[in-house]
């Protein structure tokens, strides 16, 4: 056993000796490489001495201190050799070395564990460590000092200060702090040099991670040389050459062409672990000889890398929505290609075409409005300015496709607008827009073309984008024409349209908004008069499509259900549409134009009104403008329909208008106006001005919003096409609770709505008086909105949207006609009901009559049946433009009416209103977007119903009239279910939100 143990010890000892030998060999090899490199480097500088000096054996020649003092003199420019004393005695040598070391310490060169005795004895590791510190301080640190201020910080791990030099710095109690500072300075300088190399080489596909293995192939050296002079190196050929060939070629080219001394040999690099200090010493020469190369880097990004991508985050929108701006340098000019990208299932179809689109040549017909100009740079710069500055209307020139710029200019115009999803241009409508013009089956175009348009847009997003922009331009111009008159009409449009347009117009039509302002300023373009209908650019397209469709009788099919927006639009449009009523015939093309102008202006005004509304809750001016302008078109009718002063309510009140006006007074006088005017113009406008149908269904109700008539209005059958972003996106700036509460009506609102339920009967007596007005205004109301042609245009409008949803609010007294024809007939047949609804707004004061409420409920039930029939008919035909989204206020109204609003995501390019039973939301859960929407809607609806049930118990009574309300009330009565739904919603929201967080920016 002893023999075996002895053998084991011998074997272990032998292994240890072999390991020591290997380490020693590596150390010797490294010392040899460093010695050779440092010797060459020292000789480069000693050549400058007079007389020149030369180092043959570094470890021997440095022992007397003369070489060291001469080197420091050259590097620092100070005179040190005069202190040198030549002598063979050790004491004098130590004195010379000590003077040199003292000079280094005075120069803030940290020397740890290096003393004169070790240098005088020629200790290899300490001598090399001393020389390395001199190189690092006098060359690398000085050269990288400027780079560190300009170059981006590199996240790459810096190379170590050097094995030998580090080993020569054993920390001592007295020098511990100095060691830390020295190591920190070393790493900082090395890191700066590495960052410089990376910037030079990355453009050629060479990844330099350190100053060791990354240089072994020789490609890094070649890349640095190519960065200095691209003509010297062929990187493709280098990839085929061997490592030795690349290294030899690199060192040779650097010496011959760049006059960089050859400090290294291929053998020095072709090892497993090349010496970092030697490589850094050599590479630093490139930076020393070509310091101007760093300044050129500023331009290299443009020259070498033609495309820079910049992400412009739109805070108002979900993090999913980001605009990618590609900056292309073309002939010194910058053009911008803007793609609005979203992660929502339906890809957004908004494309800002590379082709600059100028609106110089506008054909209101929109058939051929493609006036492309080369002002793309200016236009795109303006777009970027809007994105950066957030100025919605900074590009107000008609010649510029502001709608597109508005894509990026989706801004925080309102807190609400921020919360609303940013609408993208109804890209599919571009095709449909042309289709209606090309084919007169606008109903077909409107119904079928949107999908085709969507596909075609997907296929030809660029062309469509151009078309869309041009159509928008046309619409803007047309909107400008009516805006002179519609500026005031838009006042009313502001509120409702503002609510929906808060999201849409603010987001998509920042430019339109600007153009709207500009348009308002350009009141003289043409009298909005008869043919001028102000329409949002998005809806303009829809209107264009719906123009003939309405004429064909598919009015509701062509009606985009931007109910919230369009209630105001319809009221304003009702007044404007009266002009159409006066001249219905020219509207096939002009109605489109008018619809475009009206919707554009309405959307613009809506945006501004939204802005002002969120800013202030009182601003009668825009409404006054509407009153002025609407009377300009239909002053008489609106004088009757809009007698209430609330329209004069300052725009500052518009926020309340969005929330409360829609809740409370959406009907009051603006319904009167909208209904009277709309009823009058319905028959006429239906054929003549499909834009009216395109005008949001809420237009009738928008006057009260704008009028801010806070009298409790009769129960509104409010349709809300809810963008799913409203739910699961608190928009980061708005607390989730605030977003949820935004859809819950206050107790006062609930009471008002309850009183509204009571109102209908109270309105009934007034209806008698109002019937006359309604009779006079049936044509206008019907023209403004077929569904709204019924007495309470807002009810019908909401109901239409609800009809689209498939729920008839129990509170709605008047049946909604799916078709304008049918509605016109109904408006005439239901004149008492029309006047009843129209009088609901005037008779807000009569809210408190419970008997009236009972009578109203009965009438409502019968009317609901009729409306349901109409709705069923409408549902098949109704098409919702992607932009058609109601504001949260509309949502509140919808929930108050116990109707389940159809969920439309703003990103959906084609959305059809669906009749939703409580089961529809369940089916929607199968898609993650619909799941979130359904959860949100159910939660909010349940909460609202619960509050209503608690406050008045009417929810149950109303629920008895509608099976949906029954199920909802039953669901509401189960708090556990409500909390469970809320929990699920929050869970889904978190799961969907987390993947979209930009963790890289944290």
From Swiss-Prot:
Residues 1-288 are annotated as: Actin-binding. GO terms for cellular component: cytoplasm; meiotic nuclear membrane microtubule tethering complex; nuclear outer membrane. Residues 607-617 have a biased composition (Basic residues). One of its GO terms (molecular function) is actin filament binding. Widely expressed at intermediate level. Residues 149-168, 396-409, 681-697, 776-794 have a biased composition (Low complexity). It holds the Pfam family CH. Residues 500-509, 835-846, 898-910 have a biased composition (Polar residues). Keywords: Actin-binding, Membrane, Phosphoprotein, Repeat, Transmembrane, Transmembrane helix. It is found in: Membrane. One of its GO terms (biological process) is neuron projection development. The chain crosses the membrane at residues 977-997. It is a single-pass type IV membrane protein. The modification Phosphothreonine is found at residue 699. Residues 32-139, 187-291 form the Calponin-homology (CH) domain. The modification Phosphoserine is found at residues 301, 402, 619, 713, 769, 838, 841, 907. Residues 585-606, 618-635, 650-659, 818-834, 854-863 have a biased composition (Basic and acidic residues). Its main location: membrane. Residues 149-180, 389-418, 500-532, 581-716, 749-911 are annotated as: Disordered. This is Calmin. The gene is CLMN.
